[in-house]
Each structure stands twice: as structure tokens, then as C-alpha cells.
């Protein structure tokens, strides 16, 4: 095991609070725009996005695309491999292809299986990614998750320093307290020398992951500093769940993936899987 891989293994085993960084990504390349009758490839996997660490992902429990007319389509996803450069090993992931047949805003929605996390909690991940196809919907659409971010800013077409305004809903009501986390998906694995440092030379974790408290009505505002993919995360304790023969605290964890365009013509290339132009 490479030395740097041992460093990250130590960090995530002995500092479990950092495990909030475990995310399920649901992204397409080069961005979240589509065209009529043009096939689009999506990638599904697990990662510590800020560090560019790729992890294995259990088979998703449910995956569907919410179409502009309110109906759903269930694409067939296939198991594939992504490459984790921290340990120089292959990781289990998935991809699927989707061809838009309608103009308007689509939502790609995913529900994970129950996952035992490093901090000895069980999580169920509820993930959504907007796909814009030529025409803007008048009303925001939702996947219908128990925990979900409702956008008050159009969730696509962002550029650097763009601002997003949203509201968190839990069981059909605005969430009255909590926090959201905003994290950039690094297109490359960040080696130790690449990580941001504070004035004492220690890894600057707050710089990598921004956190914002919710208002009493569940509202929040965030901005995106870099072009590429970002994930907004919120989690809520929802009782306990038996996993194996033991009970663990159970959390619903919701991700909203947002793409930010560059001011320049070049696009981010993610080294974990082969870039595609469709």
C-alpha cells in the first residue's frame, strides 16, 4: 500500500467525523446539459470528493429519471470500474446511458441501499442531479425523497462564484434546524503536497468543505468558487437501523449535484474514468 494511501487510511479510521465526506456521485460529462435524441452517459460511484478518493459502491437500490411531464423512466445501469489513485486500485462503480426525448428539465434520482459508515452509523443516500435539455421548466421538480433540497435558484447554468439559494424539506415540511455541507469534486487525486494547508502547515479541512447553518425555515445560500462538479449535502437522524445483528444510529443523507461552468473553453477532465463528450 503506498505511503500516502496509509496516511489517508489513518485519517479516516481515527477521525470518524471526517466520514461525512463519503458521498455518492451521480454525474455526467462534460456537464449537466443534454440534447434531444443525443445519448448521455452518467457515472455513479462513491468518493471522498474533496480529496479525489474513489471508493467501492454497493449496487444502488433504485435509479430513475424524472421527465419534464412528470413521468419516470428507469435506465439500465451497468457495473463498471473506476480507478482510485490513492491506493492505485480499481473500485466498483456503475454507469448508464440516457437519451432525452423531451425538451425541459429532467432529474436523475438515486436511492442507495443501507450503508454502514466509518463512524458506526447507517446511512441511506438520496441523490439527485438536474439534467437540462433546451427548455427551462416553470416550476422546480423534486424526486419525492423524504429528505430533499428544493431549489429557489435554477440548479444549472452556474459559472464561477455563482450563488445558489435552496430550502431543505424533511417529510413534507421545511427542516427547522441543521446544516448543509458544500464540497467540490476534485477532478484529480490530491496528494499530500497538493492539499491546502493552514498557517501551521496542517491540512486545512474547513477550506475543503464549507458548512452553512439552515434558517428556521430550512433556507440556505451557498456559492461555488471553482468550475466543475459540486455536491450539496444534508443529513438527518431518523431513528435506528439494524445492520447485521447490531443496531446503529440511522441517517438519511441527501446529495444535490451541481455543475459550474468555466469562464474559459476548457472543461475539467476527471481522471477516475474515461472522459466522454456525449
Regions found by a protein language model. Give the residues of each.
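Beta-strand-rich domain onsets/edges
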Residues: 21-41, 120-190, 244-278
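Short tyrosine-centred short linear motifs in exposed loops/low-complexity segments
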Residues: 37, 92, 99-108, 116, ...
Amino acid at each position: 500500500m503506498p505511503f500516502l494511501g496509509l496516511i489517508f487510511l489513518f485519517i479516516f479510521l481515527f477521525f470518524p467525523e471526517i466520514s461525512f465526506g463519503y458521498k455518492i456521485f451521480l454525474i455526467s460529462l462534460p456537464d449537466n446539459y443534454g440534447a434531444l435524441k443525443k445519448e448521455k452517459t452518467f457515472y455513479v460511484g462513491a468518493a471522498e470528493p474533496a480529496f479525489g478518493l474513489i471508493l467501492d459502491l454497493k449496487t444502488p437500490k433504485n435509479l430513475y429519471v424524472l421527465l419534464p411531464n412528470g413521468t419516470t423512466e428507469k435506465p439500465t445501469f451497468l457495473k463498471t470500474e473506476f480507478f482510485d489513485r490513492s491506493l492505485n486500485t480499481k473500485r466498483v462503480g456503475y454507469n448508464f446511458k440516457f437519451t432525452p426525448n423531451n425538451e425541459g428539465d429532467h432529474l436523475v434520482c438515486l436511492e442507495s441501499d443501507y450503508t454502514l459508515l466509518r463512524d458506526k452509523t447507517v446511512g441511506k443516500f438520496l441523490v439527485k442531479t438536474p439534467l437540462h435539455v433546451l427548455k427551462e421548466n416553470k416550476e422546480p421538480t423534486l424526486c419525492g425523497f423524504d429528505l430533499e433540497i428544493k431549489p429557489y435558484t435554477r440548479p444549472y447554468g452556474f459559472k464561477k462564484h455563482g450563488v445558489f439559494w435552496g430550502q431543505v424539506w424533511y417529510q413534507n415540511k421545511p427542516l427547522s434546524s441543521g446544516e448543509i455541507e458544500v464540497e467540490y469534486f476534485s477532478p484529480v487525486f490530491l496528494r499530500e503536497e497538493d492539499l491546502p494547508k493552514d498557517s501551521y502547515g496542517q491540512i486545512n479541512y474547513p477550506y475543503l468543505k464549507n458548512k452553512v447553518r439552515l434558517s428556521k425555515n430550512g433556507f440556505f445560500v451557498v456559492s461555488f468558487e471553482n468550475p466543475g462538479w459540486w455536491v450539496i449535502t444534508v443529513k438527518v437522524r431518523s431513528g435506528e437501523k439494524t445492520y447485521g445483528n447490531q443496531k446503529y444510529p440511522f441517517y438519511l443523507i441527501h446529495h444535490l449535484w451541481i455543475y459550474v461552468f468555466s469562464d474559459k473553453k476548457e472543461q475539467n477532465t476527471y481522471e477516475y474514468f474515461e472522459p466522454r463528450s456525449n
